[in-house]
Structure formats: structure tokens, C-alpha cells
Amino acid sequence: MGDVNSKTVYFTAPRQVELREEPLPALGTDDVLVETICSAVSAGTEMLVYQGRFPRDLETDSFISGLRGGFEYPLAYGYACVGIIRETGKQVDRSLRDKSVFAFQPHTSHFILQPSSLILLPDGFSPETACFLP
């Protein structure tokens, strides 16, 4: 797939959102590249971030790799997305390619993770339904 840019939603200030294009790092030998198909929007936490009413003294979520750090602008946020594995690192089973997965990731078009951070979805499971797994 070569060099990949990801388009990510950033909350930049209260009631301000923008789409930023950023290059992804090189795929590691133990990683997979996922193309996002859909992501769910939280009417709770994400609305607080959008409105600027989030707790600035708390971490976003240290258990989700894409959300490490504090609540401060600019902030890429979101934590429920479904995608398809498009590339596998050299140490990853190639049979994972084209498999549908759930991931705790911000709203972004592409991301890189290790397979152990993904939930493989059964064949025929709709992406829209899978977004509500958490």
C-alpha cells in the first residue's frame, strides 16, 4: 500500500472541529494497517469535548493507545471504530488481511495497531452494529 496518510477528526476548540491529514508511521513487523469503515460518536463524552466541558485535569483514557494524554485542545477523540485490515507486518499472519475488526481508536481513516489490540468480527457482522460493542 506504500505511504499512507490518515485523515483524523480533531476537536480544536469549543464547538470547533477540523479534519487533519497526517502521514502514518511505517508499518512495524508486528503491526497491521486498518482502514476505518465506520465509527460511533458518543453523545456523552464526545459532546462534552465538543462543547468544551470536559474535565481538563483527567487523562483521556490510558488503556486506549490512541487516547493517551490529557483532555486539551487540539484533541483527536473517539473510541469505537470498525475497519478492515489492509496490510500486515512481516511477523503477522497474512490471513488477517481483509478481515473486519473493532478497535478502540479516535475517528480516523487509517491507523496502525498490533493485532492483539483488535477484536476480530465474525463474517456477516455489520460494521454499524459492531461500532456499539463497547
Predicted regions and their residues:
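Short N-terminal strand-loop motif that marks the start
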Residues: 1-74
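Generic structural detector for well-ordered beta-strands
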Residues: 21-23, 112, 120
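Residue-level marker of beta-strand positions
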Residues: 38, 99-101, 110
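A glycine-/small-residue-rich N-terminal strand-loop-strand element
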Residues: 75-104
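A glycine-rich, Thr/Ser-enriched phosphate-binding loop motif common to dinucleotide/cofactor-binding enzymes
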Residues: 95, 104, 123-134
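A structural motif shared across PLP-dependent enzymes of the aminotransferase-like
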Residues: 104-115
